[in-house]
A protein has these predicted regions:
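Serine-centered coil/turn micro-motif
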Residues: 99, 126-129, 194-198, 292, ...
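Structured, non-catalytic alpha/beta "coupling" segments that mediate domain-domain communication
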Residues: 101-119, 188, 604, 632, ...
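ASCE RecA-like P-loop NTPase motor cores
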Residues: 1-34, 43, 51-52, 68-74, ...
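Basic/charged alpha-beta structural segments of nucleotide/phosphate-handling enzymes
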Residues: 38-159, 174, 325-351
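Anion-coordinating catalytic cores for phosphoryl-, nucleotidyl-, and glycosidic chemistry
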Residues: 2-61, 205-828, 834-904, 908-909, ...
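Short, charged, surface-exposed secondary-structure boundary motifs
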Residues: 66-72, 197-201, 290-297, 468
Length: 915
């Protein structure tokens, strides 16, 4: 009678296999062939070494018994896309037939049907609902296409080997069971009697396999590790591995395994971290070939084409090929976002950048916008090699796409690019050799049957391990039961997760570490630990579980003996306040930086680190060049000072400017939009009475498109229509009693109120028949909530009163009645704010106090941050990164400093609310 052995892989099942092999060899001779069928090639390698004393053992996997030509997975997805598109337009799946995920779902469901040996006819006979009938018809189309192209699996009939052992399987689909039945194993070793393995055990019992009583071994007591997130969890796992090696002489890295449920969550993070720490590693799944520099080169070239030569893509590709940092500055200055036409029209000067871009155009011309897969592959590889690509595995991976012409042709360049990404991501290169001295890293499925001295299991949180278990969206479990008992039930995945957890915890010979990230790195919200941990630890609830775990803080300061790298070594040493010489050895800036931070945060008084100039040389330069008595200043600059003195210091004294990315603009910048409105209105009024608004708009739009940054084309077209309508509305609402007489009137060095000498440009000056004048300042932005008629708004609304005074100087023979902010756009709410001459006379003392305060603070070098929480000027400030995230707390500590008393006093009510 065939023998069935039950038990855990280690130590029972593996020991039973060793005994069975020895018995077989003793009975049939040392050279008698013995076949052993296992789930993975890695397990075959492990058992080969374990059974090294025996000769003529032939390990095989199910992949060694092909059932016919295998269609490429990406080809099946293309076939699924085609079938999805051909579903009835009025059928059950009509609402989702164009969705991206339907093709993948169809192929997954059809694969389950095939593995259950279910023919299209059998499916159609059990299809009792419109949904099932539609799905059965699609399955018939799928199988028909595969049959016509010789891809449909055919039952293989291999000759049974003289002797075969089946080792390590706990689940087999119908097709696999049929194969095993034909191979007629004489002994089967099943690693579990858990519920998930019961269907296999029942099937083996029907074949007269007699099970042995499983031997139970006590599980290795686990250590628990709770880390704040995946990056910290990975580092702690590595730290645990190195600590184990330190404490266990004679152990090697390959005696340790770091395992996880799915590759998506940890694979890249572990690769990057272990590479950074220079730790030898064997990644069971290998490394994606997409990480090779030549693969990156190929994908960057495709991204350049996909984005129509966007500035970002072109510069990234250029940077990959060499150092061209000056190209970044040049393209910003030219306002290049992308597009072949924009490169050609704006990049006039000969030079290496223009040569490079023209070369890209020539290479890109070798790839059509659409075509057969083979043509696209040929064109891409030719361009790639021209750019320096050489790595043969990259070329071979791309060449496999040529076979997809059978499934769908032609395809667009966008589809081709997508599939290039996929084939390079899924093609893997070996990373280290198994048990060759490197740390073993794998997903749990790939490590089945292996054992290690230390096993560290990562990601034990809900939705990771156990993975989310969901029914097939196309074929529910209830429908699967109706169709065939051979179809797998998706909700049985819960049992598989329990089984996998049992297997992985049993794979630790000496020490088991169970780890989970307790915080979501994106939201910092707590995560729920896996319910699998409760059974493994005996904890009654998650609160008790956390008490059992080693709790890694968010920012740990560690003992130096546990440091993984210099930074972790230096931090605890710095906590001990070492000498300046030690700090200097770490970094020449460290001592000064720590001293500045301590001085800034330990004092309630303002310091030189808060915007107070105290150095005599700095003050001398300030008095020489930047005090108001030496400047001809704009009203906007003065408003900036009262917005925040530190902002004024950065913008107008240090001249610090943000380095904007042209492509970051979704639409035209607010400053450019304002200038465009100004130019259009100036042209219109200057050409009166024969002005053609339509022609003026067209000319200005064309001029800006040639030189400025318009953002996305569709949004720009919408913005142009808005400009047309808002300009037309403004002109229709014009008061005929006021006639424009001056446009964009420049003035400079006008002493309007000592010590302020003003410069600026008045958008428009209107006159009435009685020789009264008014000043208009166009506003195209959003209306500021704190603006009020005849109000300085704490110094943040000085333009109207100062322009009113300037107009009086410019037109001494006329009466300047008022100055107005004219918000004439939808964003501005069509509001008008005015400042009258009468109000200005009444507030003359207040204006002088404001200007005097600014002059005195600048003279004293007081440029402290003004950062109240309410109505904060920090929200959209370009210099927020300089101030840091703690600026509001710092302001609360220091706003009572005497240096800011007068400033807060003239700011008025708003400052009082936040002081």
């Amino acid at each position: 009678m065939p023998k069935l052995v039950l038990g855990t892989f280690q130590p029972h099942l593996e020991s039973a296999l060793v005994t069975a092999v020895a018995d077989y060899k003793k009975q049939h001779g040392p050279l008698a062939p013995l076949h052993i069928l296992v789930p993975t090639r890695l397990l075959a390698l492990h058992l080969t070494r374990r059974l090294a004393p025996h000769a003529n053992l032939r390990f095989q996997t199910l992949a060694d018994f092909p059932t016919g030509p295998m269609p490429p997975p990406l080809g099946l997805e293309l076939l699924g896309r085609q079938i999805a598109r051909d579903l009835p337009a009025d059928g059950y799946f009509a609402p989702i037939r164009e969705t991206a995920g339907l093709a993948t779902a169809l192929v997954t469901t059809f694969t389950d049907l095939q593995e259950a040996n279910l023919t299209p006819t059998q499916f159609q006979q059990t299809a009792t609902t419109p949904k099932l009938r539609e799905l059965a018809a699609a399955y018939a189309t799928y199988c028909g296409w595969l049959t016509a192209h010789d891809y449909l699996p055919t039952p293989a009939a291999p000759a049974p080997p003289p002797a075969l052992f089946l080792y390590g399987f706990y689940d087999l689909n119908t097709a696999q069971r049929n194969l095993i039945a034909r191979l007629a194993p004489t002994a089967v070793f099943v690693p579990s009697s858990a519920p998930y393995a019961q269907p296999l055990l029942d099937w083996l019992h029907s074949l007269d396999f007699s099970p042995t009583t499983p031997t139970l071994h006590p599980a290795t007591p686990p250590s628990l590790l709770s880390s704040p997130g995946e990056p910290a969890e990975v580092r702690e796992a590595i730290r645990s591995a190195l600590t184990w090696l330190r404490d266990h002489p004679g152990q090697r890295l390959h005696d340790i395994a770091i395992l996880y449920r799915t590759r998506d969550q940890y694979d890249a993070l572990l690769r990057d971290t272990l590479r950074h720490l220079n730790i030898p590693t064997h990644f069971r799944s290998g490394r994606p070939i997409s990480e090779h520099p030549d693969a990156r080169l190929l994908l960057l070239f495709l991204e350049t084409l996909r984005t129509d030569y966007s500035r970002a893509a072109v510069l990234e590709l250029a940077g990959y090929l060499g150092s061209h940092t000056h190209w970044d500055r040049l393209t910003r200055e030219l306002g290049i976002i992308g597009g072949r036409q924009q490169w050609q029209t704006r990049l006039h000067q000969p030079g290496d950048l223009r040569d490079f871009v023209h070369r890209l155009f020539q290479l890109g011309d070798g790839l059509p916008a659409a075509g057969p897969w083979n043509n696209l592959v040929t064109g891409l590889l030719a361009a790639w090699r021209e750019l320096g690509g050489q790595h043969a595995p990259v070329a071979r991976a791309i060449e496999t796409l040529a076979a997809l012409d059978t499934f769908e042709s032609p395809v667009t360049l966008a589809t081709f690019t997508d599939y290039c990404h996929r084939v390079l991501d899924t093609t893997r290169e070996p990373a280290g050799r198994f048990q060759d001295g490197g740390l073993f890293v794998s997903d749990i499925m790939g490590a089945r049957g292996l054992s290690f001295s230390l096993v560290i299991v990562l990601g034990l949180v809900e939705k990771s391990f156990p993975r989310p278990i969901r029914e097939d969206p196309l074929l529910l479990d209830s429908e699967r039961r109706q169709i065939s008992p051979n179809l797998p039930l998706k909700l049985r995945g819960h049992d598989e997760e329990k089984l996998l957890f049992e297997l992985v915890t049993a794979s630790a010979r000496d020490q088991l570490v169970l780890s989970w990230p307790r915080l979501d790195p994106a939201t910092a919200r707590p995560r729920v630990p896996s319910w699998l941990l409760l059974g493994a630890t005996g904890a009654n609830d998650f609160e008790s579980l956390e008490k059992l775990a080693t709790h890694i803080p968010l920012s740990p300061i560690r003992n130096t003996t546990l440091a993984l790298e210099e930074r972790e070594f230096d931090l605890p040493v710095l906590e001990q306040n070492p000498s300046d010489a030690y700090r200097q050895a770490i970094s020449p800036f460290l001592s000064a930086g720590l001293a500045a931070a301590q001085a800034r945060w330990q004092n309630h008084a303002l310091t030189r680190h808060d915007g107070l100039l105290q150095d005599p040389a700095a003050l001398a330069l300030l008095h020489e060049r930047f005090v108001l008595e030496k400047l001809v200043i704009s009203a906007t600059s003065l408003e900036n000072f009262f917005r925040c003195p530190f902002y004024y210091f950065q913008k107008h004294i240090l001249k610090t400017e943000p380095w904007d990315e042209p492509e970051a603009a979704l639409t035209i910048a607010a400053s450019d939009l304002g200038s465009l409105y100004h130019h259009i209105l100036e042209d219109y009024y200057r050409q009166q009475p024969a002005a053609d608004l339509h022609a003026i708009l067209a000319a200005r739009f064309q001029e800006f498109e040639a030189t400025g940054v318009t953002g996305f084309a569709a949004i720009w077209e919408l913005q142009k229509q808005i400009i047309r309508e808002e300009i037309a509305t403004l002109l229709q609402r014009a008061d005929p009693a006021w006639q424009p007489i001056e446009f964009e009137r420049d003035f400079t060095d006008l002493t309007v109120s000592a010590p302020v000498r003003l410069r600026g440009k008045i958008d428009r000056i209107d006159r009435r028949d009685d020789n009264r004048l008014r000043v208009l300042d166009y506003k195209t932005g959003k209306f500021k909530a704190n603006l009020r008629d005849n109000d300085f708004c704490g110094g943040e609304a000085l333009q109207l009163p100062l322009y009113l005074l300037a107009a009086e100087k410019l037109f001494p023979d006329a009466t300047v009645e008022s100055a107005h902010y004219l918000y004439f756009t939808l964003r501005g709410g069509y509001r008008t704010i005015r400042f009258t001459q009468t109000a200005l006379l009444e507030k003359d003392a207040e204006l002088n106090r404001l200007l005097g305060t600014a002059a005195a603070m600048i003279r004293a070098g007081t440029f402290a941050q003004y950062a109240p929480v309410k109505h904060s000027p920090c929200t959209h400030c370009d210099y927020r990164p300089i101030c840091g995230n703690g600026i509001h707390k710092l302001y609360e500590r220091k706003c009572g400093d005497p240096a800011m008393t007068e400033f807060l006093a003239v700011k008025g009510a708003d400052a009082e609310e936040t002081a």
